[in-house]
């Protein structure tokens, strides 16, 4: 989904891929999709170990005036913190940098990762869920608290969304009908659109595009 979003962007931009050594495979996949992109990898020390870091000079004079798109592929919180800090330092009135990842994971949510930097970089990723709108969905939240005496967790909301979605689909026909499970729906925090895989399982392939902004 995030790749399709970037491909559909008609604005002129330069593209870059930054990854640690464990994520070289996905970096190479992105490179094949965007052959003009430039790859950067985390530094290796004298012992041959991945330091999971870059330094300012590694990226100095890299970015151009206008829009620069950077894919960051890693599962290491320290690398996210390191790279987002360096990228943030290059942003100015003429150089714009937007940060993307094809694999949003806990590394991007660590205590050492600056949300201010991610906002400045307009960090974007695909997700099957989003945060509930406490204003728009106040009625549901109030009713939940009234019944259970605590604010609904993401697990409670997901359980509600999945159950409600399945009941609606069942009421409209056979779940094995591709015209039924192929319809996209969304509720408080979750979006659903199912597709049968080659192994026979039915997978949820719906995504939100999440973007960090000020």
Describe the residue ranges of each PLM region.
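Extracytosolic ligand-binding ectodomains
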Residues: 1-214
């Amino acid at each position: 989904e995030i790749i399709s979003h970037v491909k559909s962007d008609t604005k002129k931009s330069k593209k870059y891929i930054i990854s640690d050594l464990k994520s070289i495979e996905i970096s190479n996949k992105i490179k094949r999709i965007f052959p003009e992109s430039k790859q950067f990898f985390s530094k290796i020390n004298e012992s041959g170990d991945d330091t999971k870091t870059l330094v300012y000079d590694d990226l100095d004079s890299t970015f151009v005036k206008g829009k620069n798109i950077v894919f960051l592929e890693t599962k290491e919180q320290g690398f996210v913190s390191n790279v987002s800090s360096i990228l943030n330092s290059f942003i100015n009135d003429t150089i714009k940098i937007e940060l993307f990842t094809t694999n949003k994971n806990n590394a991007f949510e660590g205590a050492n990762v600056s949300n201010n930097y991610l906002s400045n970089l307009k960090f974007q990723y695909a997700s099957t869920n989003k945060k509930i709108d406490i204003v728009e969905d106040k009625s549901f939240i109030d009713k939940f608290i009234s019944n259970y005496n605590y604010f609904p967790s993401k697990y409670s909301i997901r359980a509600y969304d999945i159950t409600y979605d399945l009941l609606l689909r069942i009421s409209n026909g056979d779940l094995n009908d591709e015209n039924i499970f192929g319809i996209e729906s969304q509720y408080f925090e979750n979006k659903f659109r199912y597709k049968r895989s080659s192994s026979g399982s039915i997978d949820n392939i719906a995504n939100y595009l999440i973007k960090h902004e000020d």
